[in-house]
């Protein structure tokens, strides 16, 4: 978990592949200024290649918002999404957030429900 300046390169690579290339979300919608102020998680494989990412925004005082959670297709189903989500939840708790909201696609609802949301 870290800031955008330290994790941007890897996070951008995963998000571009998942959101822009795979899901056809326009790059202009995927990228926003909120990244600069968010906490980010980046999970790399043994070869140090980025495999999963997500971010935690401060929605309001004491309220975090998790979003942009993405796992490369070849690593889905292996638990990386769960690891990334838990890392962001831990960062929210450490920051003192009393509540955490999700900003996610409805197609991922079953994943988040299985994680307690």
Tell me the role of every PLM-derived stretch.
Residues 71, 77-90:
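Conserved acetyl-CoA-binding loop-helix of GNAT-fold acetyltransferases
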Residues 113-117:
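Conserved acetyl-CoA-binding loop of GNAT-fold acetyltransferases
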Residues 85, 92-105:
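Conserved GNAT acetyl-CoA-binding A-motif
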Residues 18, 91, 111:
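Short alpha-helical functional segments enriched in proximate histidine and acidic residues
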Residues 42, 49-58, 62-70:
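Conserved beta-strand in the GNAT
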Residues 1-40, 44-49:
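Short amphipathic alpha-helix that is part of the acyltransferase structural core
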Residues 50, 71-72, 80, 100:
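Structured catalytic cores of enzymes that bind and process phosphorylated ligands/cofactors
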């Amino acid at each position: 978990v870290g800031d955008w300046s330290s994790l941007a390169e890897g996070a951008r690579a995963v998000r571009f592949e998942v959101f822009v290339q795979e899901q056809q979300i326009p790059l202009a919608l995927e990228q926003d200024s909120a990244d600069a102020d968010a906490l980010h998680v980046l999970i790399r494989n043994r070869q140090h290649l980025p495999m999963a990412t997500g971010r935690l925004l401060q929605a309001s005082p004491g309220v975090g918002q998790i979003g942009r959670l993405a796992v490369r297709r070849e690593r889905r189903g292996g638990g990386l999404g769960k690891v990334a989500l838990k890392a962001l939840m831990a960062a929210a708790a450490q920051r003192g957030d009393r509540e955490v909201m999700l900003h996610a696609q409805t197609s991922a609802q079953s994943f988040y429900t299985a994680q307690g949301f």
